[in-house]
């Protein structure tokens, strides 16, 4: 569970549309920055369409050592009833000024994820749409360009922009990579924008 402090009512709830962030990452290894959508009732109903899904638009915890970013969805809650996820990873390429755009188009027929204007993956509720792309190591886990099968949330969700110390949630583990970090270090956000879905 995430120690976000006292839970407060979401200031902005929304369903469907295009969600985008412009951000610049911390320089030190050990940070886990993310831009994501969450349902206030995830896992509370057996049908994830009604309970919502965790939609990870961008996570950078694999950026420093593996030079990759990830995106994708998790549904069914976080305990024994957790049902699955469909995540994608793609190579991280730095820009000249360090600023990046990440987004997702969430619509009734699925999710389309973007990194710096390029599509990096899709989630579709239709198993016939599934298409896996092998990475250079033969893994068939979600890779840029793949389409995975998963539920589509039909409920309003809220936006989270977060940074945490990678690994701190694991029992008995701290984040040693940050012990020698050069501070200050920042996850900078220029904007978060939401564009409505127009029928």
Model feature map: region roles:
Residues 1-199:
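GH16 jelly-roll
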């Amino acid at each position: 569970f995430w120690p976000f402090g006292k839970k407060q009512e979401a200031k902005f709830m929304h369903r469907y549309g295009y969600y985008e962030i412009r951000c610049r990452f911390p320089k030190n290894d050990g940070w886990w920055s993310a831009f994501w959508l969450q349902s206030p009732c995830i896992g509370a109903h057996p049908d994830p369409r009604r309970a919502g899904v965790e939609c990870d638009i961008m996570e950078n915890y694999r950026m420093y050592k593996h030079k990759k970013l990830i995106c994708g969805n998790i549904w069914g809650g976080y305990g024994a009833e957790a049902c699955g996820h469909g995540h994608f990873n793609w190579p991280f390429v730095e820009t000249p000024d360090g600023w990046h755009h990440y987004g997702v188009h969430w619509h009734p027929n699925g999710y389309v994820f973007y990194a710096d204007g390029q599509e990096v993956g899709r989630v579709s509720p239709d198993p016939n749409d599934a298409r896996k792309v092998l990475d250079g190591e033969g893994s068939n886990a979600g890779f840029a360009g793949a389409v995975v099968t998963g539920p589509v949330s039909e409920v309003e969700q809220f936006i989270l922009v977060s940074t945490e110390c990678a690994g701190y949630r694991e029992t008995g583990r701290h984040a040693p990579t940050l012990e020698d970090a050069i501070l200050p270090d920042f996850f900078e956000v220029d904007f978060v924008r939401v564009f409505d879905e127009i029928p």
